[in-house]
C-alpha cells in the first residue's frame, strides 16, 4: 500500500526524532524510518555514549516536550568546569554561579535522549513511525520522491531528510561528496568510579597524548570519561587489564579524583571530520552527523 507524506525522515535517533517532534504543531504529515527499536530498559550502569547538553539544548528539548522524560530517566547537571594542562600551571575554572545560571548543562546518555524524544513523537497524530524498517530504494522526482522499505512499505514524500548518521545511506544514495580528514586520534569512552566525589564538576586535562575528560554522572562517584589519544595507544588501553587501565588512568588524570576504577565496558572510535558538500539537494536534506561530524 502506498503512503504519502510531506516529510520522510530516515533515522530515528536523537536528531531524527527531535526533528519530527519539532513539527508537533504543524499540519505536515511526517514519517520516521528507523532500522532498530531502542531498548527502553535502563541498566543501573549508564551507557558509555553520552552527550553534554548545554542550557540552550535544554531549552530546545523543553519546547519539544522531552525534557521531563529525560529528567525522569537519568540526567546529571554539572555546575562547574575545570580545565588544566599536565605538567603546567595553565588552568581555567568557572561555575554556574559566576554566570548567574542555575547550572552549566547536563550530562545525559544518548539513549535517554532518544527514548524521551520517542515518547513525545509517539503521541503525535501527524507522525507515523516505521520501526524497525530500512529504506532500500529511493527515486527523486520533480514534485516528490518515492521510497521503498525492507518491510514492503512504499511511500512518497515531498522532502526526504537524512538523519541516519555519519555513514548516511541517504547521502550515499544521492552521491553527495564529503570533505573529510582524520584527526589521527581515537576517543576511548568508559564509565569510571572515583575514590573522591566529582561534586558535579566537569573536568578536562590536556596531556601530551591528547585531552582526557571526566564528565560527572548522577552518582556522586561515577564519571563518564572521554579519552582522546593516538590509535595505537587507544588499542593498548582497550586490551589492557582493568588493574593496569585503572593505574594508567589515575596517573594520566593527575589523581585529581583519587584512585580510578573502570566499571563495565570500554569502547573506542576514530575521530574524523566529515562535512557534506551540500546539505540540501533536490528534495533531499541532511541533518546531524549525516551532514557533518566533529
Predicted feature residues:
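Conserved Rossmann-like nucleotide-cofactor binding loop
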Residues: 15, 38, 167
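Glycine-rich FAD pyrophosphate-binding loop
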Residues: 24-48
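Conserved N-terminal helical subregion
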Residues: 73-173, 181-186
